[in-house]
A protein has these predicted regions:
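Mid-domain catalytic core of redox enzymes
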Residues: 2-126
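Short glycine/threonine-rich loop-to-helix capping motif typified by GTGT followed
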Residues: 5-11, 146-150, 182-196
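Conserved FAD/dinucleotide-binding core of flavoprotein oxidoreductases
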Residues: 33, 37-39, 63-65, 127-160
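Charged, low-complexity, helix-prone segments enriched in Lys/Glu/Asp/Gln
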Residues: 48, 97-102, 153-157, 187, ...
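Contiguous hydrophobic segments
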Residues: 92-96, 134, 159, 193-197
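A glycine-rich dinucleotide-binding beta-alpha-beta segment and adjacent secondary-structure elements
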Residues: 108-116, 169-198
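Structured binding elements
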Residues: 165
Length: 198
């Protein structure tokens, strides 16, 4: 809940149930902005509160009826590439456009997407024949321009990501049974990832 202070230094933690735990030192593996918030932030160096968090991401978890059938490596049967991190990022010019579009419009309609299919290595994650995939998407901003919010953009962004994956694996869209969308704002509110920065 918060970092306790004593004698000008961190002295322990106050937990959400009201329990206080004293400690000789407190180690925080968290975003500096979150640490200053938990500690009250009054006497911290300015660098902590001004820490730049501009690498927001968009995440989506999908349930799939079948494995993606990638045009470059055809086949719906599990193959080594299905058990690897699959990065959909064409040449540098593509990445440059994705970055520029996100800076101007808040998110890229053609982002860089990493596809992970953990059910290919752990068959307990999905029913027999089905799979789950995690889509890690880059070139999305936390703060959208023009007064737009992620509540109003998240479905369109998710559709754009699915469109992109479908260009590389034509059966992808039709194989999606369900999806869970995590915009940069969702990543912050649900997991405490400041500005959606993973």
């Amino acid at each position: 809940e918060r970092i306790l202070e004593g004698g000008g230094r961190a002295a322990g933690l106050a937990l959400s149930d009201g329990t206080e735990v004293s400690a000789r030192c407190v180690v925080a593996n968290a975003n500096p902005r979150l640490v200053t918030k938990l500690a009250g932030g009054e006497d911290w160096p300015e660098a902590f509160s001004n820490y730049q968090c501009e690498s927001a991401t968009f995440r989506m978890n999908v349930a799939l009826a079948e494995l993606p059938d990638f045009a470059c490596l055809p086949g719906k049967a599990a193959a080594p590439h299905h058990s690897s991190g699959i990065i959909l990022a064409p040449p540098l010019a593509y990445m440059d456009r994705a970055h520029a579009t996100a800076r101007e419009d808040g998110w890229s309609r053609e982002p860089i997407v990493e596809v992970l299919i953990p059910s290919t290595v752990d068959d307990t994650l999905a029913p027999k024949g089905a799979h789950v995939a995690s889509l890690f998407c880059q070139h999305f901003r936390y703060a959208l321009p023009g007064g737009r919010s992620w509540a109003g953009e998240r479905e369109r962004a998710a559709d754009a990501v699915i469109d992109l994956v479908t260009r590389h694996a034509p059966n992808f869209r039709s194989s999606v049974i369900a999806r869970r969308i995590l915009s940069p704002a969702d990543l912050e509110s649900e997991f405490g990832l400041v500005c959606g920065d993973i």
